[in-house]
């Protein structure tokens, strides 16, 4: 305890193990579902129905390229999964874990746009308690959810680990880092990542306590795949320093993308975002 800073002591003794700041910044915020999944009589085919709030930006032909289904996690929840076929000759599939305030319906248009531009298919899923997924969101469920998605991606579609890019955005970097620390893949992309919950709420925190949540900082060094980190320099939710700290701990970091002036929710609106992803997928991975 002698090495604790004053602010850390305050955290420990004045704010018990689940500080309000962590909840306010990192709480799960599932929106009202923006889609439904309807199963046919055979029980094997699911149809995606999007609400107006999903803000679908493409035609029905593009929507036909989206396959949805349900799978069960080790915690007993049924989670919704989405496979977006963006390119017939795609070498890689992104296993995409989205942020904390959206669901698959809201992300579907983005997935089509992203995948078609970087020549990748995209597989995503909703966390427990999000969209059509059952259960409640929690850290333990995050890990069980991505494990179920990983198994479904490999068994249902026969996609090998060397053709999977694990992509996490914001809270989605938590299950992504956990999975990538246990399984090798083609690469890992961390978009606006956090080091840990306590470090977001209390920036002066220097170590990981037993009650800390989402300890990416302690897991990232176990990732043996190439890691690309993307972070906005003006991120108002997860400070830019988190991306830097994770980059410094990577075994196999590639050139990061620090988006000058970008915040937490607008990195993808900057031109260099797509440019960096294209270069990473089409050029750098070939030589790694």
UniProtKB/Swiss-Prot annotation:
Pfam entry (one): Hydrolase_4
S-S bonds: none
Entry annotation: catalytic residues: 170 (charge relay system), 235 (charge relay system), 264 (charge relay system)
Catalytic activity: S-hexadecanoyl-L-cysteinyl-[protein] + H2O = L-cysteinyl-[protein] + hexadecanoate + H(+)
Cell location: Cell membrane; Recycling endosome membrane; Cell projection, Dendritic spine; Postsynaptic density membrane
Recorded topology in the membrane: Lipid-anchor
GO terms for biological process, alphabetical: negative regulation of protein localization to microtubule; positive regulation of protein localization to endosome; regulation of dendritic spine maintenance; regulation of postsynapse organization; regulation of protein localization to synapse
E.C. numbers: 3.1.2.22
The record's account of how the chain is modified after translation: Palmitoylated on cysteine residues located in a cysteine cluster at the N-terminus which promotes membrane localization.
Main location: membrane
Keywords from the named record: Cell membrane, Cell projection, Endosome, Hydrolase, Lipoprotein, Membrane, Palmitate, Postsynaptic cell membrane, Synapse
Function, as annotated: Hydrolyzes fatty acids from S-acylated cysteine residues in proteins. Has depalmitoylating activity towards NRAS.
Similarity field: Belongs to the AB hydrolase superfamily. ABHD17 family.
Protein name (record): Alpha/beta hydrolase domain-containing protein 17B
Species of provenance: Gallus gallus
Gene name of the encoded protein: ABHD17B
């Amino acid at each position: 305890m002698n090495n604790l800073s004053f602010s850390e002591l305050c955290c420990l003794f004045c704010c018990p193990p689940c500080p309000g700041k962590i909840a306010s910044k990192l709480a799960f915020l599932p929106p009202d579902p923006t889609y439904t999944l309807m199963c046919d009589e055979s029980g094997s085919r699911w149809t995606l129905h999007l609400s107006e709030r999903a803000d679908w930006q493409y035609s029905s032909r593009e929507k036909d390229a989206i396959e949805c289904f349900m799978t069960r996690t080790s915690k007993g929840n049924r989670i919704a999964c989405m496979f977006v076929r963006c390119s017939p000759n795609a070498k890689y599939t992104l296993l995409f874990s989205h942020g904390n305030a959206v669901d698959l319906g809201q992300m579907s248009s983005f997935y089509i746009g992203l995948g078609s531009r970087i020549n990748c298919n995209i597989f995503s899923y909703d966390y427990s308690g999000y969209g059509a997924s059952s259960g409640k969101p929690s850290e333990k469920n995050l890990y069980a959810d991505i494990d179920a998605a990983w198994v479904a991606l490999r068994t249902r579609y026969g996609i090998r680990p060397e053709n999977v890019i694990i992509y996490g955005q914001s809270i989605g970097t938590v299950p992504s880092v956990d999975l990538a620390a246990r399984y090798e893949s083609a690469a890992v992309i961390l978009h606006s990542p956090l080091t840990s919950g306590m470090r977001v709420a209390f920036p002066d925190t220097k170590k990981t306590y037993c009650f800390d949540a989402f300890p990416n900082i302690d897991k990232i060094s176990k990732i043996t795949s190439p890691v690309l980190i993307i972070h906005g320099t003006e991120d108002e939710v997860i400070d830019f320093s988190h991306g830097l700290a994770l980059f410094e701990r990577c075994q196999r970091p590639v050139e990061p993308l620090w988006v000058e002036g970008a915040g937490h929710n607008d990195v993808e609106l900057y031109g260099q975002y797509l440019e960096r992803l294209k270069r990473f997928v089409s050029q750098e991975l070939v030589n790694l």
